[in-house]
């Protein structure tokens, strides 16, 4: 595999709530290479979207702050860039597709106006005619029929799938090296979801861009991703090649997520597997492993000692004191 395009090392983020700095991300590390798709998975509140916002430099101010670690993108530490330089990176070399295509677009601007705005900001040498031509070509590239007509309409005239295609067009307008996708298929039905995933795979094959794909849907992970980082309560608990992760999960949380997937060959009226308990609140994080209060393998050591990441193979690491108990 080629050298990483993006390397996140020991990332720490805090949010200030009622005067207290609560750690939302704690030592998150991963890397993404050109042409690779890395999945960030975990249940709601585990820090996936915060990780993306930290990379983009879009943490809510003044409450959200990066307090540790580095974010290296193509040889530059994004955390050290002045705001004007980060502005040139964001939307140009790194783009992001946000959640909820139904609400992410501006309802009082036409599709074309919003897409042309991307070119106005990041391609200042383009004139109005060139911006319009580029926008229409981009709409056609992402599979929107009659792009000239759709250019002039408002988002409410489009279906959810078409709005998501517009979001993808806006994100890819400047041909970014890295595309961050924050649950881009959550609000779509399974047929449209499959179309969007196929579109993204095709565009990636064409451009060679890297993709950081955030989701809680392990089916999407299996379809799209090359490697996976499993997050829980602000920490990366397991990272592996997608086939290795599905075949040989080593962290109890990963094992629980996979076990909760409904099976087509299950028995009638069979109860679904669940992970007992719930994610601890930010102000109640345990001193040791954050999954300890829900883990069937937890010991006293887990409640007091943070597990270090152990490399089980070149592309498989796990942060668990008892991972050997999950070895088949």
Predicted feature residues:
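Short catalytic/signature loops enriched in Gly
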Residues: 4, 21, 148-149, 239-328
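ABC ATPase NBD coupling module
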Residues: 67, 77-95, 121, 128, ...
């Amino acid at each position: 595999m080629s050298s990483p395009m993006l390397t996140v090392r020991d990332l720490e983020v805090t949010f200030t709530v009622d005067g207290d700095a609560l750690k939302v991300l704690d030592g998150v590390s991963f890397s993404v290479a050109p042409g690779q798709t890395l999945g960030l998975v975990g249940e709601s509140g585990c820090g996936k979207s915060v990780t993306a916002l930290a990379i983009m430099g879009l943490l809510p101010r003044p409450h959200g702050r990066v307090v540790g670690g580095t974010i290296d993108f193509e040889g530059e530490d994004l955390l050290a860039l002045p705001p004007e330089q980060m502005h040139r990176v964001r939307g140009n070399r790194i783009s992001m597709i946000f959640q909820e295509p139904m609400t992410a677009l501006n309802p009082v601007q036409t599709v074309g106006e919003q897409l042309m705005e991307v070119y106005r900001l990041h391609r200042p040498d383009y004139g109005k005619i060139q911006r319009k031509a580029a926008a229409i070509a981009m709409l056609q590239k992402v599979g929107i029929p009659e792009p000239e007509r759709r250019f002039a309409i408002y988002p409410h005239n489009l279906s959810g799938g078409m709005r998501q295609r517009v979001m993808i067009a806006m994100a890819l307008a400047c041909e970014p090296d890295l595309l961050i996708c924050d649950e881009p298929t959550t609000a779509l039905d399974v047929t449209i979801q499959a179309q969007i995933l196929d579109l993204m795979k095709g565009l990636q094959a064409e451009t060679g861009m890297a993709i950081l794909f955030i989701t809680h849907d392990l089916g999407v992970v299996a379809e799209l991703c090359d490697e996976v980082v499993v997050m829980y309560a602000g920490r990366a608990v397991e990272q592996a090649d997608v086939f290795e992760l599905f075949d040989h999960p080593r962290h109890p949380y990963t094992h629980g997520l996979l076990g909760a997937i409904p099976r087509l060959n299950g028995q009638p009226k069979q109860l679904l597997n669940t992970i007992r308990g719930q994610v601890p609140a930010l102000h109640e994080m345990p001193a040791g492993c954050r999954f300890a209060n829900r883990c069937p393998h937890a010991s006293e050591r887990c409640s007091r000692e943070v597990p270090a990441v152990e490399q089980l193979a070149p592309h498989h690491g796990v942060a668990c004191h008892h991972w050997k108990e999950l070895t088949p």
